[in-house]
Amino acid sequence: MSDNDDIEVESDEEQPRFQSAADKRAHHNALERKRRDHIKDSFHSLRDSVPSLQGEKASRAQILDKATEYIQYMRRKNHTHQQDIDDLKRQNALLEQQVRALEKARSSAQLQTNYPSSDNSLYTNAKGSTISAFDGGSDSSSESEPEEPQSRKKLRMEAS
């Protein structure tokens, strides 16, 4: 943020040349006071934006130090959250792949039930493993599955 952001300051060059030296000095002092007030307000705004400084009286150096610490902390936190999002996306893709494989195994098991074989209780899934007709195509035990089917949730993708 530069000194010129959000502030309208008249320059000395915009004034007519016929002003006295005292008028020029007064005008220059007013512009300088306005610039200093803007800087002061900006430091107060920055101080109030940093949680560890809110409402405290702090020097400009302390405000800058704490603001720097807070920005670094938030960057680390954002990086960690982005890693979590990436991990969840990978996990979601893996789970969706497993769901598709199980649905495919279930549909192939249902097709095989239409063609009676010598043993109607065992079928072969897409991986070539033998499964029970009562298994639903799952390679895991039924003890680990929830009693109610969980609805699939889509991961909301945000533009980054």
Swiss-Prot record:
Location(s), subcellular: Nucleus; Cell projection, Dendrite
Effect ascribed to mutating S142L: Does not affect MYC transcriptional activity
Domain bHLH: 23-74
GO biological process: negative regulation of transcription by RNA polymerase II; positive regulation of DNA-templated transcription; positive regulation of transcription by RNA polymerase II; regulation of transcription by RNA polymerase II
Processing and modification events after translation: Reversible lysine acetylation might regulate the nuclear-cytoplasmic shuttling of specific Max complexes.
Family matches, as Gene3D superfamilies: Helix-loop-helix DNA-binding domain (4.10.280.10)
Residue numbers carrying N-acetylserine: S2
UniProt GO molecular function: DNA binding; DNA-binding transcription factor activity; DNA-binding transcription factor activity, RNA polymerase II-specific; DNA-binding transcription factor binding; DNA-binding transcription repressor activity, RNA polymerase II-specific; E-box binding; identical protein binding; protein dimerization activity
PROSITE patterns named in the record: BHLH (PS50888)
Sequence motif Nuclear localization signal, residues: 152-156
Free-text function comment from the UniProt entry: Transcription regulator. Forms a sequence-specific DNA-binding protein complex with MYC or MAD which recognizes the core sequence 5'-CAC[GA]TG-3'. The MYC:MAX complex is a transcriptional activator, whereas the MAD:MAX complex is a repressor. May repress transcription via the recruitment of a chromatin remodeling complex containing H3 'Lys-9' histone methyltransferase activity. Represses MYC transcriptional activity from E-box elements.
Disease: Pheochromocytoma: A catecholamine-producing tumor of chromaffin tissue of the adrenal medulla or sympathetic paraganglia. The cardinal symptom, reflecting the increased secretion of epinephrine and norepinephrine, is hypertension, which may be persistent or intermittent. Polydactyly-macrocephaly syndrome: An autosomal dominant syndrome characterized by progressive macrocephaly and post-axial polydactyly, a condition defined by the occurrence of supernumerary digits affecting the fifth finger and/or toe. Additional variable features include ocular anomalies, global developmental delay and autistic traits.
Protein name: Protein max
Organism phylogeny: Eukaryota, Metazoa, Chordata, Craniata, Vertebrata
Gene (name only): MAX
